[in-house]
Regions:
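C-terminal catalytic histidine-bearing segment of alpha/beta-hydrolase fold enzymes
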Residues: 1-3
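Extracytoplasmic
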Residues: 5-223
Length: 223
């Protein structure tokens, strides 16, 4: 069961934070949309440019997904942000044995969806967003977590939620131990945040347990 936390009233414009922030919205040869839009789906793997200590903090400098689990072979997905510390992989379909289209998951994610993985407590990453209209927003998280745990969200450097409980996606029926990291689920309405119109920076913190794969946060206007 996921925990829904009450909106905190923030000065979400926080011009002091934004004026000093050195990160920039993610763009590359295939993604040129700049700041991710809210309402809409925020992709965790498109965290900001800026590097360690600015756009993210990771426990080590090695990307254990791009160029690691997914060998460097010149392809966009296998080498995505390969030189950065945030560990990234992507969903894989139609393989034997099945990986991210397996029968033990609660929802099936899109194929070739990039996600942040190998998470550990204390890690965080920033995503610059462009909010269409000021107001209260609810977020649904697409994720896996073989042990459960907690995350939290900041808006422009200020805490916007308390600890958000991530339910375990462990399924004892799966005979393949490594596939416990590929049981996808959605945490509906895991968080509510109050956002001002225009640019803001969201920070996703890994608080406890880790071993989560974080793919997307889908934001919609709260009812």
């Amino acid at each position: 069961m996921t925990a829904l936390f009450t909106i905190r009233a923030l000065d979400a414009s926080n011009t002091d934070f934004l004026s000093h922030y050195k990160g920039t919205p993610y763009e590359d040869s295939q993604y040129r949309r700049g700041a991710q839009k809210i309402p809409g789906v925020v992709r965790c793997a498109y965290y900001d440019h800026g590097g360690e200590g600015v756009a993210y903090h990771d426990a080590d400098a090695k990307n254990h997904g791009s160029g690691g689990l997914n060998p460097a072979n010149g392809t966009y997905l296998n080498e995505f942000r390969m030189g950065e510390g945030v560990d990234i992989s992507y969903t894989k379909f139609k393989l034997d044995p099945q990986i991210d289209d397996n029968p033990f998951e609660q929802v099936q994610p899109p194929a070739n969806l990039l996600y942040v993985g190998w998470t550990e407590p204390g890690e965080w990453f920033n995503v610059t967003v462009d909010v269409a209209q000021a107001g209260d927003y609810t977020a649904d998280l697409l994720y896996t977590s073989n042990r459960g745990g907690t995350i939290s969200l900041d808006v422009n450097g200020e805490a916007a939620t308390g600890p958000l409980t991530i339910a375990s996606t462990f399924n004892a029926s799966d005979p393949l131990a490594w596939r416990q990291w590929h049981h996808w689920s959605i945490a509906p309405g895991i968080a509510k945040v109050r956002l001002q119109a225009g640019k803001s920076v969201l920070t996703v913190h890994i608080l406890t347990e880790g071993n989560m794969n974080l793919a997307t946060l889908a934001f919609r206007r709260a009812k």
